[in-house]
Amino acid sequence: MKKLLLAASIVYFASACLAEEKTTPFLSNSDTKIKLEGFYLFESGYIKQNHLILFDKNVTDNRKKLGFYTEVAFAATITKTINDVIAGAKIVLQPTTKAKTAASYNGSHIFIETSYGKVELGSPVDASAKLRVTGNKVTAGTGGWYRYALLDGQYMRYNGLKPDFDTNVNFYLESYSNSFDQINEKTEKARRLNFFTPKMKGFQAGISYTPDTANTGGNKNINNLTLQSSGRNGISVSRTGIKTFALGNGETMTINQNIRDAFSAGLTYEHAISEDADLKLSMTGEYGKPARRLIHSKVDGTTKTIEVLNTYKLSNLKAYNLGAVFTYGNFSCGASYSNLGKSLTSKEYYKVGRNTYYYNGAVAYGQGPIKTSLAYLKASRYKNTVNAVSLATEYKIMPGLLPYAEISHFQAKGKPVYYPEAPSKTTRGTVGLIGTKLKF
């Protein structure tokens, strides 16, 4: 408790030192504008969790319960307007710490906007991600308890395999990134084409096309699907969207969950019911075909050669999300339901279960500079479940500067999907967070 109070004192002092009002910088002439925007998060987290063994107890390399976390974004948007046509580019810089990859900050791309809508070329953020509504839209704090929890530690494993858990609402088209051997390996997602309609009577729609989710637009090695560099029909040596699981006796299952010819779309509706009441509804979805098959292979212990024993078809990507946010005066509430079905799974490996779905809800109350929220998440991934409840509060010292405190309790229950005979195990814990968000 003393350590958490010390961290709180540091965060408060830093917030007070930064409490000088600033506005978003603009540079402009008659038809060209440059907008600079950024985000910085500093957070301290304290966790207490059961069933952790040896170094699983460590939050960082040398500390068991206390850890710091930082997240940064900085972007410049350059626009030029000619005859009611806006053309521009958004350029996101790579920071020296964890990059914030939210849709509002991430995504270097070119765009053209007219009265007929907006086209984005090369954006890594798809239409469904930008138009999706979840309960977290109304919450205070960050909901970042999962950064400190370990749900697949040694206690939860069976025959060396980990159970699969989701700790927030995840969708395939925004899950993958490419490694550039830089400080941060989670900065780039697949490149795509986006189109958004203008808002008309409260409605707005968007659609995206992604040829290949392994194509980030900057891959250092496009030979992404080779069998030990000897062809294009075997096991990939890249980590982009690909997982390999050891089954014992030299056998492995390699699952390439990249997608080709992927489409995503969304539709939102906003309505002012009265002077004090507003409603926002959203429906989004994703569809695509698996890029490769699941590969069952075996490595010879002496020669180290790889023998492909069999390949299995993965199911198509089919996912959707339904969400709503209602605001009345100082009160807000949000809820969403997401279903990924059996997307990109095969019965030969996913023996315990193949379906994934999420329930997410939150209520919030704001009065002046203070906002408090209560949020709930249930995530079920292949019958492995996570339940989490978070209570958070934040205080706006000035526009853009938000110190916050948050406490979350979570429980995860499940087993590796390849072993239906494995016992289901449970781990639970509590995470306390204190931090500061700065936006400009």
Swiss-Prot record:
Signal peptide (from-to): 1-19
InterPro entries linked? Gram_neg_porin_domain, Porin_dom_sf
Sorted keywords for this record are: Signal
Q: Name one GO cellular component term.
A: membrane
UniProt key word Signal: yes
Tell me which stretches of the chain form a coiled coil: none
Name a GO molecular-function annotation: porin activity
Q: What is the designated name of this protein? A: Uncharacterized protein RP068
